[in-house]
Amino acid sequence: MLPYVIATLGSAGSTCKASTCSNSTKDYCYSARIRSTVLQGLPFGGVPTVLALDFMCFLALLFVFSILRKVAWDYGRLALVTDADSIASALHSDNHDRYERLTSVSSSVDFDQRDNGFCSWLTAIFRIKDDEIRDKCGGDAVHYLSFQRHIIGLLVAVGVLSVGIVLPVNFSGDLLENNAYSFGRTTIANLNSGNNLLWLHTSFAFLYLLLTVYSMRRHTSKMRYKEDDLVKRTLFINGISKYAEPEKIKKHFEEAYANCTVLEARPCYDVARLMFLDAERRKAERGRIYFTNLQSKENTPSMINPKPCGHLCCCVIRGCEEVEAIEYYTKLEEKLKDDYKREKEKVNEKPLGMAFVTFHNETITAIILKDFNACKCQGCACRGEPRASSCSESLHVSNWTVSYAPDPQNIYWEHLSIRGFIWWIRCLVINVVLFILLFFLTTPAIIITTMDKFNVTKPVEYLNNPIITQFFPTLLLWCFSALLPTIVYYSAFFEAHWTRSGENRTTMHKCYTFLIFMVLLLPSLGLSSLDVFFRWLFDKKFLAEAAVRFECVFLPDNGAFFVNYVIASAFIGNAMDLLRIPGLLMYMIRLCLARSAAERRNVKRHQAYEFQFGAAYAWMMCVFTVVMTYSITCPIIVPFGLMYMLLKHLVDRYNLYYAYLPAKLDKKIHSGAVNQVVAAPILCLFWLLFFSTMRTGFLAPTSMFTFVVLVITIVICLCHVCFGHFKYLSAHNYKIEHTEVDTTESRQNGRPATNLPAPKSAKYIAQVLQDSSPEGEATESEEQGSQDEELITTDGMNDTDFQSCEDSLIENEIRQ
């Protein structure tokens, strides 16, 4: 189909040999952009004006951020370590649960005295070392930042070639007007169709592909991805008989496999409601302790309105009467504690038919995994059954699905109960709703079209002003592209993935796909939404109008729109990442919904969230793809793309170190990002193929060469991604290091001791099931609450005492 369409485009486009596209073609392409999306005829595409405006906005946003950072200093300090649960965990055990749900943060987290000035945080970004980031943020953050540095190096090489060689070649053409202020003279549209210099563009596109693969291989080869020894020795088994006992699971493996020792078998249970009750119980407990201490200081009882937003009510109405705070939270705590105890007693009656099984070494784990995977049907023939034991039938071994277990900190224990048919239906409904929403609202052009129906844009129709025609449209496109990751993120969150890595990978792939359609493909083709795209693609007039559509890509001023978009992303986008406006809005909403001062303090203490690697990868790769796609047809875009990546790298270093909690993911999220990088030079080849076909026809030497290179590249990529072939040609070259666990004390006579439990922090069991017995929880909670109040009080806390205690907590919290 692709060669036929391209050949048709060539035959249709070969008739278009004029120096410029006709006015009808321009109107046809610009019509989808509603007169205010692509600049038509302004000096140098309005780039200098947009650059100046965006830079001034960037400076203003940095000033606002510095003020907010100074004013909201203590919010971030409270957010990281003052949760009572985390404090107790850090002080009393090796296990702690730092990983909560995330969106973003509303204030800066800073514990280093070296950057507590008004603008000293700017220089502190450059003084942060990778070792400090690894210790505080984890290995995934170092992986992510290394990825950015290699993209920056790639853009430096591409920028030197594009600006130093391709740009003068484009400028040497004479098809467009001989005007120093004409943006079109810098694009490939300025060259004649018979110019032999077009071979340079095709060769450089292939060179950029090779540079991209080399850069990613260098990135992956330098990153030693560390995997815990426990993870490599643990298998996750799904499909077990629901009421299978751990001893039977151990017996099966030790009978079926010689020299196999099972250290631990942990069945999984439905703990979603138990975790919810535990969280609510702790909130009520903290509220009771807060008002008890407050009453002991002020000797007056506190009254609260227990309704949501009750503290905002200025009058007392029926049904919203105030109640005594200690009495309210005491009753609520007792009720939740009773519900929690009852649910904990019933949790063993809710098995999920899953288990985590830990073995004594990696070798036997690999043998068992290979044995079960080899039994999967291939075509119509099945290659046998797994090894049997006396417990095989009762355990339903033939129904097992076996894989390596994720890291315990990577698991959403509350989501394990959502599985099978219910999970697939839930996922299907969510993604259908998401697709329908984005199907009609893919680009800002469709919004502007709706506004235009009510004559909203009529007053500015005749204004040929860069601010009207370029600044606001590109800003609008950035706003929509910023909103899209949030929508896609919440869709992935409601899908209830079992692991954080799976959630981030889904977010990354979906965000990247929709962003490429929104930002690159549809605006380039002069289409306003996916709705129009599919109607154009499957219309009977497709072949007749295809040539005109692809001419939209190579209009002289088309590249200016994307240059201005990259400028907006570099300055306004990165500045907004520093401010984290969505997180600030969410924080304000949560404060408004809080029912008392205790709950508002609890909101302040739960601002710090994990960094969203999936959304960050997707947005960054979208801008990089736009830059690489137009790096040859519009080479002036590359320096601005490099500027975006440099600012993005600095902003992410700051956010990772000061604003977000560490996240524990697997290497699949990083390898998926590497795969997406290769899509950028492939799209660049597509753009050159379309241009060559439109100008010279499909059978021209440049068109055929580009087509052959493109087909070979796509075949290699598909074979590698789908079947694992061409590993030496791939962009992956990861080296994995295993973090060995000291098992000297757990061995008896050279053989692992089966009666010694794994360290508490490494257990494959939900945190809520690792807590102490219900009888001891009340006393322990009182002690935790007392310690919490000693550490954090609203008014009477000495800053020096807080800082010293906080430093010890941070060291215990982060260094583990």
Curated annotation (Swiss-Prot):
InterPro entries: Csc1-like, CSC1/OSCA1-like_7TM, CSC1/OSCA1-like_cyt, Csc1/OSCA1-like_N
Description of post-translational modifications: Palmitoylation is required for localization to the plasma membrane and stability.
Keyword field contains Ion transport: yes
Residues annotated as transmembrane: 47-71, 139-171, 196-220, 421-450, 466-495, 500-536, 560-592, 613-631, 635-659, 667-695, 701-721
Stretches in topological domain Extracellular: 1-46, 172-195, 451-465, 537-559, 632-634, 696-700
Pfam families for this protein: PHM7_cyt, RSN1_7TM, RSN1_TM
Domain of life: Eukaryota
Reactions it catalyzes: Ca(2+)(in) = Ca(2+)(out); Mg(2+)(in) = Mg(2+)(out); K(+)(in) = K(+)(out); Na(+)(in) = Na(+)(out)
GO molecular-function terms, A-Z: calcium-activated cation channel activity; mechanosensitive monoatomic cation channel activity; osmolarity-sensing monoatomic cation channel activity; phosphatidylcholine transfer activity; phospholipid scramblase activity; sphingomyelin transfer activity
Location of the protein in the cell: Cell membrane; Lysosome membrane; Early endosome membrane
Keyword RNA-binding: no
Any one GO biological process: surfactant secretion
Keyword vocabulary terms for this entry: Calcium, Cell membrane, Endosome, Ion channel, Ion transport, Lipoprotein, Lysosome, Membrane, Palmitate, Transmembrane, Transmembrane helix, Transport
Positions of disulphide bridges: none
Membrane topology note: Multi-pass membrane protein
Region (Intracellular linker IL2) location: 224-419
Region (Gating helix): 560-592
Cytoplasmic side: 72-138, 221-420, 496-499, 593-612, 660-666, 722-816
Lipidation positions, renumbered (S-palmitoyl cysteine): 57, 119, 375, 391, 719, 722
Subunit structure: Monomer.
PANTHER family listed in its UniProt record: CSC1-LIKE PROTEIN 2, PROBABLE MEMBRANE PROTEIN DUF221-RELATED
Similarity comment: Belongs to the CSC1 (TC 1.A.17) family.
Function: Mechanosensitive cation channel with low conductance and high activation threshold. Osmosensitive cation channel preferentially activated by hypotonic stress. Also acts as a phospholipid scramblase in response to changes in membrane structure: upon changes in membrane curvature and thickness, alters its conformation and translocates phospholipids, thereby controlling plasma membrane lipid distribution.
Name of the protein this chain belongs to: Mechanosensitive cation channel TMEM63B
Gene encoding the protein: TMEM63B
